[in-house]
Amino acid sequence: MKQHISDKQLSKFFKENKLAGAIHYHTTFNRRTRYITINNNCHSTILFIHGAPASLMESKEYFTDPELRQTFNMIAVDRPGYGRSGYGDPEPSIKKQADIVKGIIDECRIHRPFIIYAASYGASIACRLLMDFPLTADGLVLVAPSLCPGEEKYLWITPLVEHSFIRKIILPHHRTSNTEKFNHKDELSKMLPWWKNIRVPVMYIQGEKDKMIYTTNAGFARENLVNVPSLEINFIKGQKHVIDKKENPFIIKKILELLKQAGQLTKTTTTSNL
């Protein structure tokens, strides 16, 4: 499915899959960001934040999964510069992207426990969100996450593309991902003092042969997520950065395990506040 799927195509996808989906637009920093909600009449919520280059449709198999549909109301966002959120117009600031996502969450009716599922560069944004707003969610699923400054593959052509005529002729989603790649090390460095602010259970999942986001990010997570109640790290044998769809049952299992942990913590917190 193409990167910048239209609202009409998205509505068709909802209808074909019998999803109670709705399309919304949120404006922050003079940026218009598209997101969707899927109401499954459930008592918990999951938000999907995609990687780069991608769009909210990166998670379409999860939208239609029977087990997840029975468990979660769903939210998914086209990150700035992707899909119908200013296609090709990037936002290099991880903090600003996190603020945009927070604004979307505030517009939605969130049933808790609330889980955030984030992949690749989307994971950086999810972590920044919970650094700045620690009470926003109850658990994090990080898939092939970019967390540590510099611990990812950088291409020699990235700065050339960023500062030459090539930028004007590449596809819009590659223009956005190139800008994010060019700025990512500096943006992650700005987050270094704040990892202690994350206080929710974390499920880390990555292909053991990932050559795009290095597996050393797992060690960084162990060293820096010092205040999370739990951190489970899973490497999937034989998988690279983009994890094959055949592994979706394993990932869904891990999402549901995290939900159980988050639910227990939410119940404990509620009881302690009575």
Language-model-detected regions and their locations in the chain:
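Conserved alpha/beta-hydrolase "acid-adjacent" motif
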Residues: 211-217, 244
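Flexible "cap/lid" loop of the alpha/beta hydrolase fold
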Residues: 124-127, 131, 140-166
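Alpha/beta-hydrolase fold catalytic core
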Residues: 1-46, 71-72, 260-274
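Catalytic histidine-centered segment of alpha/beta-hydrolase-like enzymes
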Residues: 239-249
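Short beta-strand/loop motif that positions the catalytic acidic residue
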Residues: 198, 204-206, 210
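Conserved HGGG/HGGXW glycine-rich cap/lid loop of the alpha/beta-hydrolase fold
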Residues: 38-84
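Active-site nucleophile elbow and catalytic-triad environment of alpha/beta-hydrolase enzymes
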Residues: 178-194
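Active-site loop/oxyanion-hole signature of alpha/beta-hydrolase fold enzymes
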Residues: 76-114
